[in-house]
Amino acid sequence: FEGTYRKYHGINLEGHDYTYYLEEAAKAAKTIIDEGPYKLYSTKNPDKDYMMLFAQENASTEEYILAIRNSYEAQVYHNATAYTLLPTQGRPGYTRKFINMYLMKDGKAFTDKFKTEWQTMPFTEEVKDRDPRLAQSIRTPGYKRIGAKRVQGPDLGVTITGYQPIKFVQDTTASG
């Protein structure tokens, strides 16, 4: 946090610059992965990995950092699928400010790259060339629900902001 905060807020305090903190964080993360029982979740498909980490019906037997242990057999699961897909569940949606925190694929800040044009940019342009986790967090052009064949855009009857969450949404046999 300290490194990225200093980098994106232009803070230069005495001591170390932002690169020092980012390098220290990377070293600490590598130590945890190399020496601990944990590993990063990966199916070797970065366009789906982030979404699938949160959408599994049953917990993996592997030790992952940031994993939630759901078990369909033990009836330990969430209701996020229905919550994000049904209009009777409060119509959740992320704010534009939150969506703008997702970086571009090249690592640059979205709002820095597009200065003021981002404020009137069409949705399809706004989500183009972003960190792949954005398309695994909200419905973007080309979105297909897990196990479905039909492409679905954001359902404005279900999300009040237009940024419809898909994180935790499971396949079509789940509720919703």
Predicted regions: what is each one?
Residues 152-176:
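Active-site beta-strand/loop architecture of penicillin-binding DD-peptidases
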